[in-house]
Curated annotation (Swiss-Prot):
Taxonomic path: Bacteria, Pseudomonadati, Pseudomonadota, Betaproteobacteria, Burkholderiales
Enzyme Commission designation: 2.3.1.274
GO biological process, one term: phospholipid biosynthetic process
Transmembrane segments: none
Protein name: Phosphate acyltransferase
Reported function: Catalyzes the reversible formation of acyl-phosphate (acyl-PO(4)) from acyl-[acyl-carrier-protein] (acyl-ACP). This enzyme utilizes acyl-ACP as fatty acyl donor, but not acyl-CoA.
Catalytic activity: a fatty acyl-[ACP] + phosphate = an acyl phosphate + holo-[ACP]
Pathway annotation from the record: Lipid metabolism; phospholipid metabolism
């Protein structure tokens, strides 16, 4: 099976100087992959020449005349830059010429343009950003990580359904456990939105563990953690900052004297394993779930190594049939979502699904 991916080469802080080398490295190590490199043709070809990859058969350059800047407002990306590398890359997915799109571009713009071009799956009001965070036994899938700053209870229920389908597809788990991120495990904790979301989750057919706290994220307490995009993005950035700080402290302490430098040499195998386990770059690449096409969002600041991992996320999603499984799961569970709302309503709250959905493009930050 050939996996066809589009790469938004102009997105992110570094553009083709990062995205093209990452694509070249990935193509050379994955003979069953075909990559469409979308962007300013001269800039892409200059990088390919530099890497001596002009004739690599797995790579095809697709011209696009415009770039969505990291600080461009959503309306500019959506209405004015119709020939941007982001838009052209997404159009190739819509037209069936590629199976997934990978971009390090402006988060708000990518979400808005993706939703406009690809549309959402049946039963989904808002797409969400999902990514894997490490735990001692593997990883925990967490969503939303920045697409929706403000959420209604039914959105958190839909995120849980999507997280369930994603982990089931990637890990083969029939009933992955779901946790709702809160300030305490007790049912009475949290704001009204969280309490109502908890009622919906308890009334659903999902394997709902209950409320989880921030320290559960890296324990592996549950398979999927659900939260709104504001909380999720703060948690993600905090964890990355902590990992970087720990690495810097260890490097600084081992470099203090000749003795500590000798100790560092002796401890090098352990240090390298530690560095690999806390290196956030290998977890780069978050899926925009809920769309009628696969979209992977890379960090805007990612280097070539990190962006290559984002490409791998898209590749793995295609190989595992994530989109098809997600669409099937949402279609099958659409009725159960409504039933959960009715059950929760009977428990004392009006059904939030009957309410007016909030503004869909809550996330307007320039970088994820």
């Amino acid at each position: 099976m050939t996996v066809k991916l589009t790469i938004d080469c102009m997105g992110g802080d570094h553009g083709p100087s990062v995205t093209v080398p990452a694509a070249v490295n990935f193509a050379r190590s994955h003979p069953d992959a075909q990559l469409l490199l979308v962007g300013i043709e001269s800039a892409i070809r200059a990088q390919l020449k530099k890497l001596k990859a002009q004739d690599l058969p797995a790579l095809t350059v697709v011209p696009a005349s415009e770039i969505v800047a990291m600080d461009d407002p959503v309306e500019v990306a959506l209405r004015k830059k119709k020939d941007s590398s982001m838009r052209v890359a997404l159009n190739r997915v819509k037209e069936g010429e590629a199976q997934a799109c990978i971009s390090a571009g402006n988060t708000g713009a990518l979400m808005a343009v993706s939703r406009y071009v690809l549309k959402t799956l049946s039963g989904i009001e808002r797409p969400a950003i999902a990514s894997a965070l490490p735990n001692p036994n593997g990883y925990t899938m967490m969503l939303d990580l920045g697409a929706n700053v403000d959420c209604e209870p039914q959105h958190l229920l839909q995120f849980a359904e999507m997280g369930h389908a994603l982990v089931s597809a990637l890990e083969g788990k029939e009933r992955p456990t779901i946790g709702l991120l809160n300030i305490g495990e007790e049912v009475i904790k949290g704001n009204d939105t969280i309490k109502r979301a908890g009622e919906l989750l308890r009334a659903s057919t999902l394997n709902f563990h209950g409320n989880v706290e921030g320290n559960d994220i890296f324990k592996g307490t549950v398979d999927v953690i659900v939260c709104d995009g504001f909380v999720g993005n703060v948690a993600l950035k905090t964890s990355e900052g902590l990992a970087q700080m720990l690495s810097n402290i260890i490097k600084e302490e081992f470099g203090r004297s000749l003795l500590t430098k000798v100790m560092a040499v002796l401890a090098l195998p352990v240090l390298m394993r530690f560095k690999k386990r806390v290196d956030h770059r290998q977890y780069n690449g978050a899926a925009l779930l809920g769309l009628r096409g696969l979209v992977i969002k890379s960090h805007g600041s990612a280097d070539a190594y990190g962006f290559e991992w984002a490409i791998k996320r898209g590749y793995d999603a295609v190989k595992n049939g994530v989109l098809e499984r997600l669409a099937r799961a949402m279609e099958e569970n659409e009725g159960s979502l409504e039933q959960a709302a009715r059950d929760a309503s009977g428990a004392g709250h009006a059904s939030p699904i009957a309410g007016q959905p909030a503004e869909p493009y809550a996330a307007q930050s320039s970088k994820a």
